[in-house]
Amino acid sequence: MAGHSKWANIKRQKARVDAKKGKTFTQLSRAIIVAARNGLPDPAANLQLRTAIEKAKAAGIPNDNIERAIAKGAGTYGNDENNLEEIRYEGYGPGGVAILIEALTDNRNRTAADLRAAFSKNGGNLGETGCVSWMFDQKGVVILEGKVEEEVLLDASVEGGADTYEIFDSDEEQGAEVFTEVSNLETLNQTLQEKGLPVKEAELRWIPNNSIEVTDPEQGRSLLKLMDALESLDDVQNVTANFDMADELIALTIA
């Protein structure tokens, strides 16, 4: 698939280098609240909720906090979180790289101000709605972690209705990402699990149609600093961008 998200790959590498926790407890709890609010509060029947819970557990969020977040989303634990909105913001990074941000917020003005500050401090600009979203398509992605036999993955992908897949097989990383249409994500996820493949999680992801090649180390460093700054904001759930960068340059910028 053209334009697999390079930022998703870089985040995996950065996690190995600096061992930072990814999302904050606030970000992960909000994802659970909204998933429970948008669908059934039962993770067995709600893939979005199940994925949010799995990410929260992986980050060490206590079960009591997870249950409370589910109850808030279901409307059985007070009404403080009912004002959370899902909003998409768009902008440009250094070198004209298009950046798409998904946020959950109870205060649009605060979120916009925080995003604008992050962009301006790191050589970018927060844009108007629609300025870059046309450059991306949303896909379902099933993430596998561990040794993957390509023949098994190919058969399961065909049976599960996948569009394509990408295998990672190196000393540092083994696994794969399998891509499909949004409406088929649950089916693909179940099929891969039934075939015994090491499914870690499933998610929706914005995939760029085309990518800008970043070759300048300073530009690359500024861009990754901006992406980190955006990801670190409590209101931000996901960030993606339409750039590509050689692995050698990535190693220099995240070392």
From Swiss-Prot:
Classify the main location: cytoplasm
Can you provide one Gene Ontology molecular function annotated for this UniProt record? DNA binding
Where does the protein end up? Cytoplasm
Q: Which Gene3D superfamilies match?
A: 1.10.10.200, 3.30.70.980
Give the UniProt entry's GO cellular component terms: cytosol
Q: Which GO terms describe its biological process?
A: regulation of DNA-templated transcription
The record's InterPro entries line, in alphabetical order, gives: Integrase-like_N, TACO1_YebC-like_2nd/3rd_dom, TACO1_YebC_N, Transcrip_reg_TACO1-like, Transcrip_reg_TACO1-like_dom3, YebC-like
Q: Which domain of life is it from?
A: Bacteria
Keywords, alphabetical:
Cytoplasm, DNA-binding, Transcription, Transcription regulation
Family under the similarity heading: Belongs to the TACO1 family.
Which protein, by its recorded name, is this?
Probable transcriptional regulatory protein PCC7424_2775
